[in-house]
A protein has these predicted regions:
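Conserved flavin/dinucleotide-binding core of flavoenzymes
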Residues: 75-76, 92-219
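Mid-domain catalytic core of redox enzymes
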Residues: 2-111, 116-129, 137, 141-142, ...
């Protein structure tokens, strides 16, 4: 991506081996910050550096299914988070089959366990067997499970949730200040104004309305 003398953005695209160019007065980048960094680097090195420095620790997710009758704790709720003082490797657990219909057969509980993150990034890089062992044994401890899992699946994210570390608000302010110097360039992502899906949707709607208003006001 680069800016032409006219002020338009020129974007080089490659898809299925075919290359093409697009010209636009408005660009919305809705990617993780590291990807956005690479895209904006030709336009602003300073902005690219700010985006690239946002940390995303690794996270591994272990899905385990058990017979409900083997779980002593009633699964009446969302799940649980684990406080650091507990000394466990897992960060928390979501009770999928309690939250959503159709997630597991009758009489079966599907649980999602989170391992790693900023608190314990090395744990996210355990082998599959080690992850399952950790997740299962610590769920046994937390929920009183008296059986082996009937189903096991694992998903890994090398860069999971952006961290709002000390100084993040100042970083976002600087990012927004630099964007004002590049008219037409817009960023959306969970690294700016909230990590939840709701936060991102709210921000996306705001940016979309703003860009639509600018486009419709053009002569």
């Amino acid at each position: 991506m680069r800016i032409a003398d006219s002020g338009d953005f020129i974007v080089d695209l490659a898809r299925a081996g075919n290359r093409t160019k697009l010209n636009s007065k408005q660009i919305i980048i809705a990617t993780p910050s590291s990807v956005a960094s690479a895209l904006v680097a030709p336009v602003s090195k300073e902005l690219a550096t700010l985006l690239d420095e946002i940390p995303y620790p690794p996270l591994s997710i272990v899905y385990l299914a058990y017979e409900k009758s083997a779980i002593k704790t009633p699964l009446d709720g969302f799940g649980f988070l684990v406080a650091p003082a507990e000394g466990l490797n897992i960060l928390g657990c979501v009770w999928n089959s309690s939250l959503f219909d159709g997630r597991a057969p009758q009489g079966t509980a599907l649980l999602t366990v989170f391992v790693g993150g900023a608190r314990n990034p090395q744990a996210a890089r355990l082998t599959d067997a080690e992850l399952v062992s950790v997740a299962h044994s610590e769920l046994q401890q937390a929920l009183g499970i008296a059986s082996e899992p009937q189903l096991i699946a694992i998903t890994r994210y090398d860069r999971a949730i952006p961290q709002y570390n000390l100084g993040h608000a100042a970083r976002v302010q600087k990012v927004e200040s630099l964007l004002k110097e590049i008219p037409g360039l817009n960023l959306i992502g969970n690294y700016l104004h909230g990590v939840s899906t709701g936060d991102v949707i709210k921000e996306a709607e705001r940016v979309a309305k703003e860009v639509a208003g600018l486009i419709s006001s053009r002569p």
